């Protein structure tokens, strides 16, 4: 019996070249994690909220996907889409680059703004998209943020912005830098009106965005492991000629030094934002206490010094957490003092 044509002929290794080798896996089926280098199925990553199932690394999330994760279905209303682009420095190739990214991403710029509901809480939402020139802040990005915040002030709505950026957009020069002051001024007016602004920092948040709207939130949250800073660690290391502390400019480092109020897992982000927004909604008290006075006085002067010490050391003495549980329905701890402390 002859088996000449029964088995598929294989090519020897020595005859393989870069041109003849073709991927055996269909394009778009697998995604490589930049941290653990594992190849994971794209669908598995999607089902896990774009978190690596092997090492927990957070993949970057596109703006519309973020909206789907955070906003109640069907509630997002986009604002200020299609604002005209400018090229103030007449930078060569800038217009063509913008047009190419618009076609590739389906976005008009590096941020998506609009109104949404988060578990029924009306909110103005802004989401940066790193695919669009690393979400750098140019005139259109600054204008969209400013318009969204000003409208939120008029309609007395809270603002939530998911920041992700490489900083100011160098192709627009001083016009880009002006957006830092412009967005900050709008947020100051929003704050003066007594309204809430929550900033959520994702990987990476750097440059002029860090120096403006990203770090101006009443409450500042971050995703685990996010790089947050003005200049990047490589630039700082080369400038000062010294080794940087372990974890420098990571979200955990900033939380430890008082610049963040909390680090929130992506799977818990919507629930956390919903809880914070609900706490800041104006609501009438569910009930007013009508009972008798429950406090009673004990004269400590009747006790000896040692008896007072024993009372202070009593293991059954209520702690701060005990009082919080008794007095409030919900409590969310905020860490940041913005002074390099807690």
What are the residue ranges of the model-derived segments?
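Intrinsically disordered, low-complexity segments enriched in small/flexible residues
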Residues: 1-107, 115-118, 271-342
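Residue-level preference for nonpolar/small residues embedded in alpha-helices
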Residues: 25, 44, 108, 144, ...
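Charged, alpha-helix-enriched surfaces in structured cytosolic catalytic cores
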Residues: 28, 47-50, 62, 140, ...
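Structured core elements
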Residues: 32, 51, 112-115, 124-126, ...
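Cleft-lining beta-strand/loop regions that shape enzyme active-site pockets
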Residues: 112-191, 198, 338
């Amino acid at each position: 019996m002859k088996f000449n044509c029964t088995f598929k002929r294989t090519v020897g290794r020595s005859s393989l070249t870069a041109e003849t080798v073709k991927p055996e896996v269909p394009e778009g089926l697998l995604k490589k994690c930049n941290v653990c280098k594992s190849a994971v199925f794209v669908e598995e990553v999607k089902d896990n909220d774009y978190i690596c199932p092997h090492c927990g690394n957070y993949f970057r999330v596109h703006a519309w996907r973020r909206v789907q994760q955070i906003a109640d279905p069907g509630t997002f209303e986009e604002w200020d889409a299609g604002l005209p682009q400018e090229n103030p420095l007449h930078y060569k190739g800038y217009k063509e680059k913008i047009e190419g990214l618009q076609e590739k991403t389906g976005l008009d710029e590096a941020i998506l703004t609009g109104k949404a509901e988060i578990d029924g809480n009306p909110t103005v939402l802004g989401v940066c998209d790193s695919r669009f020139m690393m979400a750098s802040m140019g005139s259109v990005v600054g204008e969209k943020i400013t318009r969204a915040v000003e409208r939120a002030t008029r309609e007395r709505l809270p603002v939530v912005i998911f920041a992700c950026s490489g900083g100011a957009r160098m192709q627009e020069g001083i016009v880009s830098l002006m957006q830092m002051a412009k967005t900050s001024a709008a947020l100051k007016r929003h704050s003066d009106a007594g309204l809430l602004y929550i900033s959520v920092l994702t990987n990476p948040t750097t440059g002029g965005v860090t120096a403006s709207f990203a770090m101006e939130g009443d409450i500042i949250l971050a995703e685990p492991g996010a790089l947050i800073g003005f200049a990047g660690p490589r630039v700082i290391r080369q400038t000062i000629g010294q080794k940087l502390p372990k974890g420098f400019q990571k979200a955990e480092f900033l939380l430890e030094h008082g610049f963040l109020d909390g680090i929130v897992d992506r799977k818990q982000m919507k629930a956390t934002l919903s809880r914070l927004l609900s706490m800041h909604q104006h609501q009438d008290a569910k009930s007013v206490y009508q009972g008798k006075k429950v406090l009673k006085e004990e004269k400590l002067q009747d006790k000896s010094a040692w008896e007072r010490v024993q009372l202070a050391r009593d293991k059954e003495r209520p702690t701060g957490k005990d009082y919080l549980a008794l007095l409030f329905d919900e409590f969310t701890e905020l860490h940041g003092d913005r002074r390099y402390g807690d």
